[in-house]
Amino acid sequence: MPTHSLNQKRSLLYPSIDNGSVPDSSFLSQSFRDTNDIHLLSARLASVEVDPETLPSNSPETNDDVSNYDYMSISSYQRAHSLASTSRNDFNYRPSEINETRPLLPEREEHSSQLPPAQNQVLPFQSLNAPSKKLRGRISLSKIYQFFFDDKGPILFILNIPAVIIGLLLNILDALSYGLILFPISDPLFKNLGADGLAIYYVSCVVSQLVYSLGGSFFKGSVGSEMIEVIPFFHQIAFTILNRVGEDNPKSVIATTILAYCLSSILTGLVFFILGILRLGRLIEFFPRHILLGCIGGVGSFLVLTAVEVSSRLEGSVSFNWASLSALFQPMTFAKWSIPLFLSSALEFAQQRWPHPFLIPSFFVIAPAIFYVLVWAIPGMSLEYLRETGWVFSSTETNVPWYHFYSLFSLRDTDWSALLATVPEMCALTFFGILHVPINVPALAISLGLDFVDTDKELIAHGVSNTLSGAVGSIQNYMTYTNSLMFIRSGGNNRLAGIMLALATVALLVIGPGIIAYIPVWTVGCLIYLLGIELLKESLWDPIGITTKIEYFTICAIVFTMTVVDFVVGIVIGIIMACVFFVIQASSRSALRGIYSGGIVRSTVRRPMNQQRFLNEIGRQIQVCKLSGFLFFGTINGVEKNIAGLIEELNVSNNPLRFLIIDFSLVNGADFSVVQAFLRIRRMLATMNVQLCVCGLDETRSSFKTLTTMCFGGDDNCGCQVFEDVNSSLEYCENMLLDDYDVYRTKLLHKAGYSHTLAVPGKHKQNISMAETFSPSPRHDLLRQVAMSSVKAETKELSKFEKYAKYEQPFPLLMQVFGEITTKREDFWLGLCPFFKKAFLRKGDLLWRKGDTPSKLVILETGMVKASYQMDRESLSENITCLCVVGELPFFSKTCYNATVVAELDSAVWILDREGWETMLKSSDKAEVIENEMLYLTLKMTRDKFNVFTNFALNLYR
């Protein structure tokens, strides 16, 4: 029965190692501990090429007895010399500092402080105007003066007047657009609340303007106003309360409605404040942009319908039925709502053709003036007649003081059950309101050329302004992008200008809403039309060609639902559709990043030539499946189908799969459905006798813990092996193939009469019995065929190696390493042997560090060394087994070592140092031939190594 566990195989290969000496900490740590065993197996498999009985010691300096070496456990060499007692041709190696006991941070050295006194230093990010400890808490009048006047003095009052006029005009226009329709004035119950809506709007503007201008906002000239997108939610709240309370109790309806408005502002402010305090400003950016566009489109359609209602002066709201449509197309009514629609469309076209910031304000200043000139010029036309016919607002609607809306509050008349029924609308209003700050703040910063703005600070400012606004009986507000940009560019980029604008707005509030009685209805309708058209254009026209078809369909669905059904329902449907389409899109992208053959992608272990030749042929039995992204029910089924298809395809091609490696290094997480899928995959592979190896699992993640425990851990794991990285997985699979190859190779060489050539006697007794138990199968037939092909190529050189065995080292070693690739005869290499010196390395001994001057190259006779390549962000290690050369490219090219090399096991090595190399060239009359041959061999070996690293990096690390 084959051994599936690496610890079980280790007990057969190395009986002297106690598997229970290391305490278990977790399943993954147990599997990672097998990595050292994999390296031992790589070294043992490579050491097959060295026969201690036929390859005697090299020189009288090192009278090494071969019997001192225990080849069953390479880590237990008995050496005659330590490196501390070598001759001048040997090198002093220091114990490696790269081990488990080395601290991550060096010990802090004590130095005398040479720094100047702390009070004379300016610390980073420390304000130059920060008060000293003695003056902390005092209010400096000079700083207040600097805060408001910016070193310009009292003349700043005069300089700010144009900007204040522009800001005040914008507030008036917004009041007519937003404030006048704060309540659904088309309904008879709310018909007379237009003036109160204006007053509430102005109070909200004043509160937000004071908060921003007194230091709440980073922008000195920011302008606060009501958010037009909240109007539909306010109307929804009003109608919800009206339906719950009934039309027969108007006082309770109005009291409950206005209280709900204030509570929604407080709720919005608290959410803003909490997000800012917790520094979660970027959290809002994760909300899908196309859902926001759909909501904006829904608001735009609502504003268009509201403009029709306000302009037509019909009782009730516009409905999609025959009675409402027939009333709208009465001649006089049609003229009332079609004229502002035509003007707003023409104004939108003009704005696209001539995008000047003062175009719209100028129109709404000049157009009413022209209107009144025409009224005065037309005989028989009077203002009272226009009010009676609905062309100008009635004076009865505005004959109230500005503070009248406070009289509408009444806790006694408030219907608390109806108020609770509006909580969903409040939450939707809050949710929609907080989406605009992370959009407007960066947009304004870019327009003003500012590099950095603290969004969290702006959220806190919005939290304060909205909470205060709700506390004083007003509604939501935010920093408007358009108004702020026009105000700043008009010269209002200072905090004094914001204070002056707030005071001017207070004056406008105190004057009262009587001015409304002189405003044409079509002016307000044109404003509302213009806003609605712009929002519809932003949501339905601008995304064409930018968004995907699915996203655009979602936008249209949200707009339609908000227009026909309900605003809250529209938002919910949009979120549901976004989630569904996200699952569909995520499922369409395969989580399987790629499938790579082990014949192309190899581990970074440097092995002898014949083993590399064998792995190039048999490596197809190893397949690496690299996964990426988040694994969930939508993607894991595709992975399962691909794995089943891969196995079937390889079986049909007479190249059956033996090892499947699944790499999780690029996987972010997994849900529970993935666990069930991998249980099925594991059972399928076990049925087909395919070894499953997984790597890259992050034990710190809860989803991976569940996956590891249920699928790859426990006693019933179907022989699954877990490794730290894909390199260790590949090394393990290659070692298993090489271990079987070693068995076939020994038997084939024995039949061919080479039983004592290069094999170690008595080493494979256990393995032969294990190999003989293999049942005939296509994968083992392929293994035998490749082994026979490799051994056939190898036997061509075996007769030479038998001849070389009678020579002293390092000549046999040099011929084994370079014999297959060199173009020179034996006498060439015999002449080089005296310049190589033998040395012994203990485990952990340091050969050289990265960046050191290249002073030697090393040929491994036994054991293994590890080369660590450390880049800026990534690191890669290469295990180098015996019969391999180390450091040849830096040595001959005279460039610094590019890796740190440490003895991974006790090793016997042959060293050619710089002094020996130069002596070799000086003492030979064929120095140029020697140099060219060594450079040729170096380039050839580097090419093979480069191919391995390139395939590994491009396929598995991309």
Curated annotation (Swiss-Prot):
The keyword Transmembrane helix applies. Disruption phenotype: Decreases cellular and vacuolar levels of basic amino acids (arginine, histidine and lysine). Small vacuoles. InterPro entries: cNMP-bd_dom, cNMP-bd_dom_sf, Membrane-Transporter-like, RmlC-like_jellyroll, SLC26A/SulP_dom, STAS_dom, STAS_dom_sf. Keywords: Amino-acid transport, Membrane, Transmembrane, Transmembrane helix, Transport, Vacuole. GO terms for cellular component: fungal-type vacuole membrane; plasma membrane. The chain crosses the membrane at residues 153-173, 199-219, 258-278, 291-311, 327-347, 358-378, 426-446, 499-519, 521-541, 543-563, 564-584, 627-647, 659-679. GO terms for biological process: basic amino acid transmembrane import into vacuole. It holds the Pfam family STAS. It is found in: Vacuole membrane. Residues 612-733 form the STAS domain. PROSITE patterns: STAS. It is a multi-pass membrane protein. One of its GO terms (molecular function) is basic amino acid transmembrane transporter activity. C-terminal GFP or HA(3) tagging interferes with activity. Amino acid transporter involved in vacuolar uptake of basic amino acids for storage. This is Vacuolar basic amino acid transporter vsb1. It comes from Schizosaccharomyces pombe (strain 972 / ATCC 24843) (Fission yeast). The lineage of its organism: Eukaryota, Fungi, Dikarya, Ascomycota, Taphrinomycotina. The gene is vsb1.
